[in-house]
Amino acid sequence: MINKCLRELIESREFISLASCDLSGRPNAAPKFLLKVEGDYLYLVDYIIGRTFSNLQINPRASLSFIDSNTLIGYQINGRVEIVDAGPEYRGVIKELQDKQIDLSITRIIEGVTKGKGHKSFEVEIPDQFVILKVKMEEVVEMRPSGTLKREKV
């Protein structure tokens, strides 16, 4: 299980970069919408259904990355991905996704008004077709600005 500080750092993010690879070794990295953290699982939304989706169908290993801009510590989360595109679990996250979509849209509107930020689109739209990427966290790598790495099995 990941520690509380890392969990909170992940939960504060809206998007996270996911890297995948096809069987010939061709890499692909793309931002994914972070839906939730539950136990040792991250739930991401893939609404493009392109190379990431294709890669994960044949090679379900992925690496996620992000940086804490306050500490400049980078994180890499490695694990196995299950594509959830039907069934009770899929239907169960639809409500959570709709709620998060509303919260994010409200936040963007408030920021736009109070900070004078301009957004081309304040509302976050979730397309009709999407899949959930359920990532089982297996390893967390912490990369410090000093160049030191700390690897931990989850």
Place the predicted regions along the sequence by residue.
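N-terminal structural module
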Residues: 1-47
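Short, surface-exposed beta-edge/turn micro-motifs
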Residues: 13-16, 40-41, 59-62, 130-132
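Short, structured patches in soluble enzyme cores that scaffold and shape functional sites
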Residues: 20, 66-68, 135-139
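Histidine- and/or cysteine-centered catalytic micro-motif in compact active-site loops
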Residues: 21-23, 32, 47-49, 67-69, ...
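A short mixed-secondary-structure module that forms the rim of ligand-binding clefts
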Residues: 34-72
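Charged, gly/pro-rich active-site loop segments
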Residues: 74-154
